[in-house]
A protein has these predicted regions:
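Canonical P-loop GTPase G-domain recognition
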Residues: 6-83
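Short linear motifs at secondary-structure transitions and domain/linker junctions
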Residues: 5-8, 54-56, 66-67, 89-95, ...
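Short, surface-exposed secondary-structure boundary micro-motifs
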Residues: 158-159
Length: 160
């Protein structure tokens, strides 16, 4: 459930607790969003937005929380590819195996799938580069049965 508030003070909103109770009864979740806050941060740079959110005790915007909740509800995840022309996120359903994920990029990738070189986004960021992560053995070679994970950074090897 999405709960839209014009004030950032959810505790003082008499309807918020009612919505939480309904969500609990329906085995659902509530994503509170403050319209004024979202409007304020929409024009900020990423750096200013993160500083502002940290100052008010939040780690991410309501919009980001809404997107994550939507992905969870729909059973979706994202994986990343990085090459010379672009870095891109691809959306797939949970449980998708590597060859089918490769097919989202191009049907030839699925047809000629050999393997996927995979590293988690967190490991990549922590190490600064794929080369540094490879030195530590964090880049894995996965086969046709590998089930893609949210945040995988992948290089698909294929031959057609």
């Amino acid at each position: 459930m999405l709960f839209r508030s014009f004030s950032g003070k959810l505790d003082s909103n008499p309807f918020y607790n009612e919505v939480l109770e309904i969500a609990r009864e329906e085995n659902s979740e509530v994503v509170p969003i403050c319209a004024r806050l979202e409007e304020e941060i929409s024009d900020m740079s990423m750096e200013d937005k993160m500083m502002f959110l940290e100052e008010i005790g939040l780690q991410e915007s309501g919009l980001d929380r809404l997107i994550k909740a939507g992905y969870h509800l729909l059973g979706l995840l994202s994986y990343l590819t990085a090459g010379k022309p672009e870095v891109r996120a691809w959306t797939i359903t949970r449980g998708t195996k590597a060859p089918q994920a490769a097919g989202k990029i191009h049907s030839d990738f699925e047809r000629g799938f050999i393997r996927a070189e995979v590293i988690s986004y967190e490991d990549l960021i922590a190490n600064g580069s794929i080369a540094a992560a490879k030195e530590k053995g964090l880049v894995r070679s996965e086969g046709k049965e590998y089930v893609m994970q949210d945040g995988d950074v992948v290089l698909f090897r294929f031959n057609v």
